[in-house]
């Protein structure tokens, strides 16, 4: 598993310097030239910074030990044993809670895209300050697969809540890739990326056609659907839940700095020029191999 995932980590640890904004591309193994899942990610952060690389070895922890990642965030109970992991750190004077990437000893890759600007009315209370950076770090320390990464992250969200506006997390191993879109509080949707698909996301929520009946491909925080029905953003009779439309205003979904990247990416990947932001795909099945 470790060797098969090396191409993923090579892409994940791409240099920051020339990026204009964060983007993530996931290529399923059936449409990858290597036969492996490929995760390509660039991390864009402005100002002066260092992009440092580390290896953190596996560790054993004392019973009752806790971890705290931001001064204002919740203390999280630590597990007894944690995995070793490679860590690409965006180091800035004031700290960067949402920029680091990871590749652990189980072959799990973690990368994220900022997806903010949610509806003000949707903000929720969080427990003891909530969790932010801890999601990625604890997944890197604990997850033995991409699917388990989703389980770990969503359990943390259920207990503490997310204090940031929102992000989309990409988790991949040698066999599966998943994306987890997190909205502030405890609102989220998770999608398994199929082997014959490609997914591209810039810095806005892209998940749209959440099939509430497809439990193998999709997972969603159930109370979010209830809230959307109550708010008039979703018809309870419709089994397809348009996640990005529910969580983000139209002006955010149409922002040009994201839309322009979507146009270019999907034209390259599919040969189709999408100009209407409401019609940008979340994923696509393609008939050629990429690498």
Language-model features and meaning:
Residues 142-148:
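Short, charged, surface-exposed loops that flank catalytic or proteolytic processing sites
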Residues 136-142:
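Short, well-ordered beta-strand elements within core beta-sheets of diverse protein domains
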Residues 22-132, 152-290:
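A contiguous strand-loop segment
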Residues 2-20:
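Gram-negative bacterial Sec-dependent N-terminal signal peptides
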């Amino acid at each position: 598993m470790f060797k098969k995932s090396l191409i993923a980590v090579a892409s994940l640890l791409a240099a920051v310097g020339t990026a204009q904004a964060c983007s993530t591309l996931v290529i399923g193994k059936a449409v990858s030239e290597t036969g492996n899942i490929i995760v390509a990610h660039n991390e864009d952060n402005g100002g002066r910074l260092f992009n440092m690389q580390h290896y953190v070895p596996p560790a054993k922890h004392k019973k009752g030990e806790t971890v705290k990642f931001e001064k204002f965030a919740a203390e999280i109970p630590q597990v007894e044993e944690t995995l070793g992991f490679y860590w690409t750190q965006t180091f800035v004077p004031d700290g960067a809670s949402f920029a680091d990437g990871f590749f652990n000893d189980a072959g799990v890759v973690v990368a994220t895209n900022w997806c903010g600007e949610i509806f003000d009315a949707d903000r929720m209370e969080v427990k003891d300050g909530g969790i932010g950076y801890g999601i990625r770090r604890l997944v890197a320390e604990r997850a033995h697969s991409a699917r388990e990464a989703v389980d770990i992250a969503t359990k943390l969200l259920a207990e503490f809540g997310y204090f940031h506006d929102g992000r989309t997390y990409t988790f991949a191993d040698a066999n599966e890739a998943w994306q987890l879109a997190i909205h502030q509080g405890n609102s989220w949707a998770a999608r398994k990326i199929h082997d014959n698909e490609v997914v591209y996301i810039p810095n806005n929520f892209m998940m749209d056609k959440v099939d509430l009946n497809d439990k193998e491909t999709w997972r969603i925080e159930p109370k979010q659907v209830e809230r959307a029905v109550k708010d008039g953003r979703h018809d309870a009779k419709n089994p397809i839940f348009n996640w990005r439309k529910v969580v983000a205003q139209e002006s955010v979904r149409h922002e040009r700095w994201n839309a322009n990247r979507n146009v270019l990416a999907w034209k390259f990947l599919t040969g189709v020029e999408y100009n209407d932001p409401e019609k940008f795909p979340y994923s696509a099945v393609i008939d050629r191999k990429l690498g």
